[in-house]
């Protein structure tokens, strides 16, 4: 089984992949378009988490394909579902994923449900303000942003929006 990671699964997959490789998923973009009321915010003060959002243009989301040992596949899938489907804001999708070495593998990933109440479309500056202040059950929203932006840089995956947000949030949290 393969898993496509584009956010926290990059730096905290929750399992030990037996193989990992850069992968680019066409038709989606990485976006802070989901309100987080559990992991990185609360119902009273929601944070924002990344989701795959269907792209209206020819966008591609760059991330990692993480291969799960088949003996662990069912357990890992149950754990992923418990983590990612904590609310119904994500929808599980099995996608045809092009890997960097030319292979194509069927992979599970999690896509935002645009009809869900947690779906949102804020500008970058408003996203930064939310991320700078929100804290949830798994820690601060800024930690989530910084770890994801750092991992993308380490992997050589450019994401100008996350870089902008990381700088903006760092400035906001310094002045707080």
Predicted regions mapped to residue ranges:
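A glycine-rich, hydrophobic/aromatic-adjacent loop/helix-cap motif
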Residues: 1-176
């Amino acid at each position: 089984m393969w898993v496509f990671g584009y956010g926290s699964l990059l730096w905290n997959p929750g399992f030990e992949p037996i193989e990992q490789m850069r992968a680019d998923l066409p038709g989606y973009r990485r976006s802070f378009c989901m309100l987080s009321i559990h992991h990185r915010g609360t119902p009273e003060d929601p944070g924002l988490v990344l989701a795959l959002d269907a792209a209206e243009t020819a966008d591609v989301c760059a991330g990692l394909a993480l291969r799960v040992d088949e003996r662990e596949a069912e357990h890992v899938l149950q754990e992923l579902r418990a983590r990612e489907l904590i609310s119904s804001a994500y929808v599980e999708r099995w996608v045809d994923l092009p890997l960097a070495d030319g292979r194509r593998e069927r992979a599970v990933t999690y896509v935002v449900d645009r009809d869900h109440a947690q779906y949102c479309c804020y500008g970058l500056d408003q996203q930064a303000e939310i991320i700078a202040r929100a804290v949830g059950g798994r820690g601060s929203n800024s930690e989530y942003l910084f770890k994801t932006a750092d991992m993308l840089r380490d992997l050589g995956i450019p994401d100008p929006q996350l870089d902008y947000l990381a700088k903006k949030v760092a400035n906001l949290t310094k002045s707080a």
